């Protein structure tokens, strides 16, 4: 009946559906496990009936981490290939999320997910996630302020006639957004980024 249908719709709306779509250059390790652990400690989410994600996905996108000697952006051909494949996968993901499809876990965790999350990830958190190595090549910088504008945590001030300055508030994610968006390649991360490429999604 119409009344039953309407009642079912209300029940569906009340049932929480949490999902996660994460991106990576090659693999995500134990990202979803860590997320679920965080959700389990969040009283506000627990009160809403959310104890873990109902569906999880990973999209392999072009490499953007350039903070180590052996890491650089992908060649153009690989970049295009990854973006094309991810666009197709994203269409399917959107449909499944719209339909609130539960129990889906299409993830690229990598060959040794615990090692890259716990050991390598731990090293990154302690040593490599910092703004202290960022600096500007003043002979290239035009003081446009793009780096300050795109920083997701507001860790950079500058532009409008001033050189960029990292604020060392310990908020830096070392996401390299400032590096990749600089139109004159004037931002470096120690010596690790010299002669390396830039990438951001267009």
Task: Please provide the spans of the model-predicted regions.
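Iron-sulfur cluster-binding cysteine motifs and their immediate structural context
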Residues: 136, 142, 146-167, 171, ...
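FMN-binding flavodoxin-like domain, especially the glycine-rich phosphate-binding loop
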Residues: 2-123
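Rossmann-like NAD(P)-binding element
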Residues: 1, 176
């Amino acid at each position: 009946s119409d009344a039953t249908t309407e009642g079912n719709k209300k029940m569906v709306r009340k049932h929480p559906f949490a999902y996660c779509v994460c991106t990576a250059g090659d693999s995500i390790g134990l990202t979803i496990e860590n997320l679920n652990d965080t959700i389990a400690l969040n009283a506000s989410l627990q009160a809403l009936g959310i104890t873990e994600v109902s569906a999880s996905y990973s999209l392999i996108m072009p490499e953007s981490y350039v903070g180590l000697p052996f890491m650089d952006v992908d060649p153009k051909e690989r970049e295009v290939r990854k973006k094309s494949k991810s666009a197709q996968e994203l269409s399917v993901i959107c449909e499944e999320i719209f339909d609130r499809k539960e129990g889906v876990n299409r993830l690229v965790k990598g060959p040794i997910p615990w090692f890259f999350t716990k050991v390598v990830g731990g090293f990154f958190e302690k040593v490599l996630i910092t703004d202290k190595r960022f600096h500007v090549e003043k002979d290239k910088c035009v003081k446009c302020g793009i780096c300050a504008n795109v920083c997701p945590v507001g860790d950079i001030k500058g532009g409008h006639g001033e050189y960029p300055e990292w604020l060392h508030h310990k908020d830096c994610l070392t996401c390299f957004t400032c590096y990749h968006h600089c139109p004159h390649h004037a931002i470096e991360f120690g010596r690790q980024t010299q002669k390396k490429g830039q990438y951001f999604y267009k």
